[in-house]
Design a protein with these regions (language model features):
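Compositionally biased terminal segments of proteins
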Residues: 1-179
């Protein structure tokens, strides 16, 4: 495979590089969109076996946020590169599904962070995707983050004021799923 990667699992490709005298393993997981509302592991896709991720279709369909990065490695080497990242709504769609199937604190915290970014860049309910994935994701976010009884905000932070802020951000950015 190009760039020295080798297939180590059905959807995982790895290569080792020397980093300041130590081996550093680089890994890439190949994913495909799931057109259901749940993670579908071990899906045949040509010669690969991959994971199908709900919400990924939204990220692929929307314009990415292009980030230009300049970083200095611990070796002193400077790297400059450009990477397309999911814009905030796409990230919220994927993270909402991740939270729903894992109920992990890190996913709750990520949702809060992305909600803050979405609000900061001026996104509103009018920007939300209109299709089935948008409606399903809105339902997940309102259920788990948009009400006082929802557990998501408490998993993201113990601060009650910030929990209230998270609920307010959901109301500001995510349309009600019943509309």
């Amino acid at each position: 495979m190009s760039n020295g990667y080798r297939q180590t699992q059905g959807n995982r490709f790895s290569r080792s590089v020397d980093h300041d005298g130590a081996a550093l393993d680089l890994e890439i997981d190949v994913l495909i969109p799931s057109y259901t509302d749940h993670l579908e592991s071990n899906q045949p896709f040509g010669d690969l076996v991959v994971d199908a991720i709900p919400g990924l279709s939204t990220a692929i369909a929307r314009r990415p946020t292009v980030v230009h990065v300049i970083t200095t490695l611990t070796t002193g080497v400077e790297l400059a590169y450009t990477v397309p990242l999911p814009e905030p709504i796409s990230a919220l769609c994927m993270k909402a599904y991740a939270y729903r199937w894992r109920f992990a604190e890190r996913d709750a915290l990520d949702i809060w962070r992305v909600l803050e970014v979405a609000r900061k860049v001026g996104l509103t309910v009018a920007d939300w995707p209109k299709g089935a994935t948008g409606r399903a994701t809105a339902r997940i976010l309102h259920t788990h983050f948009g009400t006082p009884a929802a557990r998501g905000p408490a998993m993201a932070t113990a601060d009650k004021a910030m929990q209230t802020r998270i609920r307010a951000l959901v109301l500001a950015v995510v349309p009600r799923s019943d509309t």
